[in-house]
From Swiss-Prot:
UniProt main location, coarse: nucleus
Designated name of the protein: Mating-type switching protein swi10
Summary of subunit composition and partner proteins: Heterodimer composed of rad16 and swi10.
An example Gene Ontology molecular-function term: endonuclease activity
DNA-binding region: 76-98
Gene3D superfamilies: 3.40.50.10130, 5' to 3' exonuclease, C-terminal subdomain
Biological process, per Gene Ontology: double-strand break repair via single-strand annealing; gene conversion at mating-type locus; mating type switching; mitotic recombination; UV-damage excision repair
CDD domains recorded: ERCC1_C-like
Classification lineage: Eukaryota, Fungi, Dikarya, Ascomycota, Taphrinomycotina
Organism for this UniProt entry: Schizosaccharomyces pombe (strain 972 / ATCC 24843) (Fission yeast)
Matching Pfam families: HHH_5 (PF14520), Rad10 (PF03834)
Matches recorded under InterPro entries: ERCC1-like_central_dom, ERCC1/RAD10/SWI10, Restrct_endonuc-II-like, RuvA_2-like
Amino acid sequence: MSDIDDEEFEQLAVSALEEVEKKAGFAQQPTPQKVSRVTAHSILVNPRQKGNPLLPHVRNVPWEYTDIVPDFVMGTGICSLFLSLKYHHLHPEYIYSRISKLGKSYNLRILLILVDVENHQASIQELVKTSIVNQYTLILAWSSEEAARYLETYKAYENMSPALIMEKPSTDYLSQVQSFLTSIRGINKSDSLSLLSKFGSLERALVASRDELEQLEGWGPTKVNRFLEAVQQPFMSHSTIKRPEAINLKQT
């Protein structure tokens, strides 16, 4: 008998297992994509999820079965538990035991719910409360394809910079002035435009009198008081300034 290398042996074993499953009448399970031994770029899947209809729809990132406590791990500190509402109605205690077992092992814990029943309102309300109490992020998916997209997206954006979703600071003069003025309680963008239209610049507005400010459209006494308090009060109270101790210049 000729020698068989590891790869050939693995292929023979897989073929034999598939043949046994066909004869036994087992449903065909999705095959994990082949990945390198380094799993940093793949979604980790708990073997209990074999047969989950969402798995065939995870096509844009690799995934593989491995021994983990959650159902899916999409990155360092990011995991997900999966729950079908149809299964939840039959086994309502299941998800609570899974949450208890997982504990707080991950920074971001997601409860991915597949809404596959018509009467779902009461169950969703119950699971929302459970998610809040246990500090989970709850996501509702209305199909297996949608659920798979959520897993793929979390994995794809795992190492993305937060700058992608951060508000870009405005650099033009008007936006910067409006940002400053609207930071004062009670003053909105319309108020800031009225102020700039009247005085032409922030510099002139800062030295305007109370009477001039009260003539602005939409500026009543309360708004004027808040504006003047904000621009006239000192940055630091004199009572909080500590004077340095006197230095003894005498020779000892």
